[in-house]
Amino acid sequence: MVQKTSMSRGPYPSSQEIPMEVFDPSPQGKYSKRKGRFKRSDGSTSSDTTSNSFVRQGSAESYTSRPSDSDVSLEEDREALRKEAERQALAQLEKAKTKPVAFAVRTNVGYNPSPGDEVPVQGVAITFEPKDFLHIKEKYNNDWWIGRLVKEGCEVGFIPSPVKLDSLRLLQEQKLRQNRLSSSKSGDNSSSSLGDVVTGTRRPTPPASAKQKQKSTEHVPPYDVVPSMRPIILVGPSLKGYEVTDMMQKALFDFLKHRFDGRISITRVTADISLAKRSVLNNPSKHIIIERSNTRSSLAEVQSEIERIFELARTLQLVALDADTINHPAQLSKTSLAPIIVYIKITSPKVLQRLIKSRGKSQSKHLNVQIAASEKLAQCPPEMFDIILDENQLEDACEHLAEYLEAYWKATHPPSSTPPNPLLNRTMATAALAASPAPVSNLQGPYLASGDQSLERATGEHASVHEYPGELGQPPGLYPSSHPPGRAGTLRALSRQDTFDADTPGNRNSAYTELGDSCVDMETDPSEGPGLGDPAGGSTPPARQGSWEDEEEDYEEELTDNRNRGRNKARYCAEGGGPVLGRNKNELEGWGRGVYIR
């Protein structure tokens, strides 16, 4: 009976097997064998299970074995588009190498590219740190600029725009929040309670400071627009407007004019550019306060001077500013100028005292003010200065400055970029001069372009030493001789006529050295009249720079014998006592006669 039932059930699976083989005849032998194996292992047939497994397996194979033509075509299209975009980006990068610099920025944040940043060309993004300088050539798209890091050996690449940096910052903050949440959830109760206790003990003071830091970081932009070439500004050894400081800075200006002839623009700035703070210029409510205060410069004059400096820097020439009002690096720390601060340092206060006293009573009576200003500069950390010139010999200090500026020139002028057009530079400098305000109208166009005119100081006075780090009410500075200052007292700086009275006629006839046989056209103020050069007010004959070792009796004879600038042995800073300075007390005056600020 059992056999009959088994025999009667036999045709059913065979009848079920036929349509399956018709549906898919190709795997007939394989699946027939598989079914035979099931029969031998089990006493009864399991055709339902076999057929179900067959259908499931067949459907999976049909799904995976069917390559989606649309997916393949999409992938190919995406790859082709990516390669084409990369090719165009590389071509645009290559063209940007010879394009002029559109503008420059100073970074407030750092950037290290990662694969997920979607750089137009992988591996060509620029890495930079905070306080680096970037030359921007052009805008590639809304997320990326094309430019280069101002550093020797760096080529053009892709720089994230402020929009891109903000988006990357937001993504990073989201990841940090998620990590904190996951770490807090994974922590056990004991660690969380311990963390609460620790944070509870710190809650009284830090939250306010943390909020302040958060606000300050939120409002800081990633980039600050700065001049394409950082302007060079000299400070020290004491206050400007006094003979010792003026003649030392004048010697360096003379050196720069000849060493970088054709590559430097030297211009005088009489406006108080320390007022050009971003917080002041961007806040209209502060404009009224400054306009009402007793300042020597209006905001319109300051803004005009800043624009003129930016225009001069666009030529990619070196720009040196003879700024009357800048005596401390803190005055420019919050401006957009980002200058190269050169600190002329006299290490020994005794040497500075001897130099001041050697200039006569007119300078000695202001000894305390100058010493206090020198001490104020000496207290600054070295990070506030780009170059510190503390050499004893003038020529050593000049070479130190020249090495720094040569390196900066190479960093701003890579070999791949085309050299600037001298005619364009001269035209732009002259145009910038024409747009300059009245206080700097005495500047000459050729002097801005190639440094052919002499520098000039105006009669004026200085504020107290404690005022020059940037107080808005009483900014320091020089006042034009045609506008006598309203303040007077022991802190009043000497007028130019006062300083000349302390010198001999031979001192007033001396001038700085000119290369070759060229003459120097002396500029004079209306209040001075003749007396800087010859009695008729003409030009001063070229002379070599004096040395502290020159004897007073031999000075007039040496002026006619030695006119070679290369033989200059002038020493502008010395350490120690008398034996280091020279042979007698009169040798301190040789500096002032050989190189005198006009």
Swiss-Prot record:
What processes in GO biological process is this protein linked to? Answer: calcium ion transport; chemical synaptic transmission
Which sequence positions carry the modification called Phosphoserine? 44, 47, 73, 186, 193, 547
Region annotation Disordered: where it falls in the sequence: 1-79, 179-223, 466-586
**Which GO terms fall under molecular function for this chain's record?**
calcium channel activity; high voltage-gated calcium channel activity
Topology class, membrane: Peripheral membrane protein
GO CC terms for this protein?
A: sarcolemma; synapse; voltage-gated calcium channel complex
Does the keyword section mention Membrane?
yes
Where are the compositionally biased (Acidic residues) regions?
548-559
Q: Would the keyword tRNA processing be found if you checked this record's keyword annotation? A: no
TM segment ranges: none
SMART domains reported for this sequence: GuKc
List modified residues, type Phosphothreonine: 499
Bias (Low complexity) occurs at 43-53, 182-193
Q: Which residues form the SH3 domain?
A: 100-169
Name where it's found.
Answer: Cell membrane, Sarcolemma; Cell membrane
* PANTHER family on file: VOLTAGE-DEPENDENT CALCIUM CHANNEL BETA SUBUNIT (PTHR11824)
Q: Which family does it belong to?
A: Belongs to the calcium channel beta subunit family.
* Purpose of the protein: Regulatory subunit of L-type calcium channels. Regulates the activity of L-type calcium channels that contain CACNA1A as pore-forming subunit. Regulates the activity of L-type calcium channels that contain CACNA1C as pore-forming subunit and increases the presence of the channel complex at the cell membrane. Required for functional expression L-type calcium channels that contain CACNA1D as pore-forming subunit. Regulates the activity of L-type calcium channels that contain CACNA1B as pore-forming subunit.
Protein name, UniProt field: Voltage-dependent L-type calcium channel subunit beta-1
Q: Recite the lineage of the species.
A: Eukaryota, Metazoa, Chordata, Craniata, Vertebrata
Which gene is this protein's source? CACNB1
